[in-house]
């Protein structure tokens, strides 16, 4: 990548003279600027688009939000997700600010690309159309995540100056939704996006992902006809199917499997997360800040289809995890369950109070609930539990459930 550098030549008269004037309104020499970046780099568009994907979603947001519900608990009393869960949060809480800042940074990146893509030289028209489609869907998803959490939010499709960003007003939620749906309709109806990608481009927004996001928006608004129509199209034309193993669905060996419609992109060494450090037991190097709650465990039904409290249930308190929905074993680490290491070794965990290294109450790094998380365990992790495993944002099971709800 080359950057044009303009030399400033000061005349000898100015240097020698007692008074001189230096033009401070010049481009910096040590980095590219917006003045030249788009025109000089033929890959400027795809590089900018890749940056937009960084803000699509992340693993810690995916998992920590469970602590706002009856599914999980975070043992740090000053944690913002705990505050949201008990209703004591404020806009100054770190998690709230992180979601707000992250989503609006993603929106700004999309707006930067959309405003400047015409300046990129020799960009293939079909690629340009696709990049615009990807950016508009990414922006739509960011707005969806904002208005579903905050209601009325500032809406803009331009890059704001600092002054403008300090004075922009909130836009009515209904207007935000209408604008987001208009963008999605443009992309979907205009065939901006392919239905699939080659191996080098897996993880990018497809036509089906755009439609799935549109279905989620309509589901949130209770427009059942639209939800049914969109999800039915995905079901009949998308070529997706449920993955054969629920546990395997969330393993790095099975990324981009038949059920994944949209996931946030991570990659070993280049973009990783360290969420396993947050939810694993001490035996595997974790400190279990985030732990499943009993309410989540109790919600898994028996193999006979009955709940554990239903009359005639086969639930046995002396063997509480036997004959349960297999998703329980794949999601929650309980006493007798195990993590499989890369070499095939099974590490069996004992969560019982006062027992071993991982038992409830044994140490500050142990679970606060007597359970650990198993879902999204990545046995290919690097040192200190760094992982490149992608969190799934939308999968085919979501489409089936939305379709059923809309009937």
Where does each model-flagged region fall?
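Bacterial Sec-dependent N-terminal signal peptides
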Residues: 1-30
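Secondary-structure transition into beta-strands, especially the periplasmic turns and strand N-termini
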Residues: 4, 18-20, 119-136, 221-236, ...
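Membrane-proximal, proline-rich intrinsically disordered regions
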Residues: 20-64, 300-311, 318-319
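Proline-centered turn/helix-capping motifs that create local helix->coil transitions or kinks
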Residues: 22-25, 60-62, 73-77, 146-155, ...
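Conserved, well-structured interaction surfaces
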Residues: 41-57, 79-150, 165-178, 184-198, ...
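Hydrophobic, small-residue-rich alpha-helical packing segments that form membrane-like cores
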Residues: 155, 159-255
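Polar, glycine-rich mid-to-C-terminal structural blocks
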Residues: 213-222, 231-318
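Flexible, polar/acidic helix-loop-strand segments at domain edges
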Residues: 315-395
């Amino acid at each position: 990548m080359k950057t044009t550098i303009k030399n400033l030549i000061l005349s000898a008269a100015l240097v020698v003279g007692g008074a001189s004037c230096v033009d401070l309104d010049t481009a910096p020499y040590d980095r590219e600027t917006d003045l030249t970046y788009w025109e000089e780099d033929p890959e400027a568009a795809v590089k900018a688009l890749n940056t937009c994907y960084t803000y699509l979603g992340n693993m810690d947001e995916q998992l920590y939000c469970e602590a706002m519900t009856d599914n999980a608990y975070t043992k740090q009393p000053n944690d913002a997700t705990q505050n949201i869960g008990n209703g004591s949060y404020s806009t100054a809480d770190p998690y709230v600010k992180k979601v707000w800042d992250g989503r609006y940074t993603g929106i700004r990146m999309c707006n930067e690309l959309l405003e400047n893509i015409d300046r990129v030289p020799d960009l293939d028209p079909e690629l340009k159309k696709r990049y615009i489609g990807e950016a508009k869907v990414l922006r739509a998803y960011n707005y969806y995540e904002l208005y579903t959490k905050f209601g009325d939010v500032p809406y803009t499709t331009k890059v704001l100056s600092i002054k403008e960003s300090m004075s922009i007003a909130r836009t009515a939620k209904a207007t935000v939704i209408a604008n987001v749906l208009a963008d999605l309709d443009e992309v979907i109806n205009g065939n901006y996006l392919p239905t699939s990608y080659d191996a080098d481009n897996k993880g990018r927004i497809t036509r089906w992902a755009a439609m799935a996001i549109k279905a989620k928006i309509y589901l949130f608004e209770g427009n059942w006809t639209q939800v049914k129509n969109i999800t039915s199209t995905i079901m009949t034309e998308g070529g997706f199917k449920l993955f054969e193993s629920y546990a395997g669905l969330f393993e790095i060996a099975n990324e981009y499997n038949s059920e994944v419609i949209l996931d946030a992109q991570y990659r070993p060494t280049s973009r990783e997360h360290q969420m396993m450090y947050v939810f694993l037991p001490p035996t595997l190097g974790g400190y279990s800040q985030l732990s499943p709650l009993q309410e989540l465990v109790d919600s898994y039904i028996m193999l006979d289809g009955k709940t554990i409290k239903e009359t005639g249930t086969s639930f046995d308190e002396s063997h509480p995890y036997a004959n349960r929905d297999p998703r329980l074993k794949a999601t929650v680490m309980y006493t007798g369950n195990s993590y499989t290491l890369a070499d095939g070794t099974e590490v069996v965990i004992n969560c019982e109070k006062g027992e071993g290294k991982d038992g409830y109450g044994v140490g500050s790094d142990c679970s606060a609930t007597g359970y650990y998380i198993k879902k999204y365990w990545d046995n290919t992790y690097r040192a200190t539990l760094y992982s490149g495993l992608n969190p799934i944002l939308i999968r085919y099971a979501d489409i089936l459930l939305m379709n059923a709800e809309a009937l």
